A protein has these predicted regions:
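N-terminal leader/linker segments that initiate helical-solenoid repeat arrays
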Residues: 28-113, 133, 399
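Canonical positions in the second alpha-helix
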Residues: 63, 100-104, 137-138, 171-172, ...
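Start-of-helix register in tetratricopeptide repeats
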Residues: 72, 79, 113, 147, ...
Length: 402
């Protein structure tokens, strides 16, 4: 598949970022690089020299260099870097965003716009407590701040605080559009046993909303695909994934979800052309390597070693931001079941999304140790999550003799 794509920098609605990050970005990146000096040359952006995005970033960097305390410029630059990190899967851009906010980063009560941006960057580094403190302060100061409520919902979802997430979504009712609110509630209810009803609700809200940007279309279609899978409808899921894929934007969250679908369907040959140009992104390189190993492709060993090097470097830094992905790497690419289980258990302490449960259940099954995944088994029953594959794995795990 090939399609001309664009980079969407600074245009993606915050709720789309928030819920997309709840799916992948919160769980999967290496630590962002933060320059120690303002004069450090960062990275040549992966866009064409004449691209308007590159021109805007150069201009913003020049403006901020001339006046580092100009908050409007700093925030615009941080936003652009953060959006680029989302589009490209390169966490270094989050470090650059944090560097742009340096004058406000350690203030106890920064201005509202800087406070919310700081929270967004904190959650990226898994400082969920710090991020929620900032977001709580933001919603106290401005109860109609949709951005802060959206990110609160995203973090509450990642940590399986479903009632709090529902309250966050409901706070958006008089602030944002019907599609906005439907998307928030569908993300919650689609995880907690109401996939069919919320598929209908989100589909109807999407149809009523009229013309939407490619970003909104991709987000909604990806969520509809995920809900289709939870209903056991692979055909419908693929239709939604493909419709999202052919929107003319880069979206690594869609690519990761679509690649997982293809891998689960036993179609690794379709994953390679999908992800071959995405080796900079850890989450996508992992899926590419899984496909290559399944096909015994020549690049598999190279990409497995690249991932091993990245995970080893993260361990030396004390970086624990990507334990779910590292667990999957250990279990399926290098066969270290013990380490996979330990990583999956450690990851579950902080993150309790369906994919976090999946790797914990699968690692425990590989080790024939149901007790090791008891918390994930309890979550599955308590949440009512419907995914047939997850429930089948749980059933196999429960069937093991103690």
């Amino acid at each position: 598949m090939s399609i001309i794509r664009t980079y969407t920098i600074g245009t993606v609605t915050d709720w789309l970022r928030a819920f997309a990050l709840a799916s992948f970005a919160i769980t999967a990146y290496a630590a962002p690089y933060i320059p120690k000096e303002d004069s450090v040359v960062l990275e040549h952006l992966p866009v064409r020299p004449g691209d308007p995005v590159a021109r805007e970033l150069r201009q913003l960097r020049a403006e901020l260099s001339a006046n580092p305390r100009k908050r409007d410029t700093a925030l615009r630059l941080a936003e652009r870097y953060f959006a680029l990190a989302n589009a490209e899967g390169d966490p270094r851009y989050v470090g650059y965003a944090q560097a742009a906010l340096k004058p406000w980063w350690d203030l106890p009560a920064p201005p509202l716009d800087a406070l919310v941006m700081r929270a967004i960057l904190k959650q990226y580094s898994h400082d969920f407590y710090g991020a929620m403190q900032d977001l709580a302060a933001a919603t106290r100061e401005d109860p109609r701040n949709a951005r802060a409520w959206s990110w609160r919902a995203a973090i509450d979802m990642v940590q399986a605080r479903y009632e709090q997430a529902r309250n966050d979504c409901l706070a958006l009712r008089n602030i944002q559009s019907d599609l906005y609110v439907a998307g928030c509630i569908a993300y919650l209810d689609g995880t907690t046993g109401k996939a069919a009803a919320d598929y209908r609700a989100l589909s109807e809200a999407f149809a009523r909303s009229g013309e939407n940007s490619p970003e909104i279309k991709v987000w909604v279609l990806t969520r509809l695909a995920e809900m289709s899978l939870r209903m056991g409808n692979a055909k419908q899921a693929e239709e939604n994934f493909r419709a999202a894929y052919f929107e003319p934007i880069n979206d690594q969250f869609l690519l990761a979800a679509y690649a997982d679908f293809l891998l689960d369907q036993g179609r690794p040959d379709e994953v390679i052309p999908l992800l071959v140009d995405w080796v900079r992104s850890d989450i996508l390189l992992l899926r590419l390597a899984l496909a290559e190993k399944a096909l015994k492709a020549s690049k598999a060993a190279e990409h497995i070693e690249a991932l091993r090097s990245r995970f080893d470097a993260a361990a030396l830094r004390g970086d624990k931001l990507h334990q779910q992905e590292e667990a999957r790497f250990n279990l399926y690419l290098i066969g270290n079941k013990e380490k996979a289980l330990a990583l999956a258990q450690e990851n579950w302490k902080l993150q309790r999304e369906p994919r976090d449960a999946r790797i914990l259940l699968e690692a425990a099954l590989a080790m024939k140790n149901p007790a090791a995944a008891q918390e994930a088994l309890d979550w599955l029953e308590r949440s009512g999550h419907e995914d047939p594959g997850l429930r089948a794995t749980a059933q196999r795990l429960r069937a093991l003799k103690p």
